[in-house]
């Protein structure tokens, strides 16, 4: 049997938690910047409808759907019309697949 040092276990636990927190927080800030950089905020807001639906409404629509992030990322990248009213969403050909997925995950997580 090995001797387990409880202080060592606690320290590793706290270090892991701190690392997880730092990693979890990074994409949110990055996605906010990404949304601003790609002019998403010109038509969308977190909690209210502008030209397009609010991010909260989008998250509600996709809630519980299998592959919601991939589906939303595809819509972000290719644009479309008729899902949210008469104003079409333009395609985003300059947006990478990874950035579209990051934006989709950010929206689905409450755009925080």
Locations of regions flagged by a protein language model:
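N-terminal secretory signal peptides that target proteins for export/translocation
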Residues: 1-12
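Sec-dependent signal peptide recognition
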Residues: 10-20
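Sequence/structural segment immediately N-terminal to covalent heme-attachment motifs in c-type
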Residues: 29-46
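Axial heme c-ligation environment in periplasmic c-type cytochrome domains
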Residues: 42, 51-62, 74-104
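Short, solvent-exposed mixed-charge patches
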Residues: 111-112
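N-terminal signal peptide c-region/cleavage motif recognized by signal peptidases
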Residues: 23-27
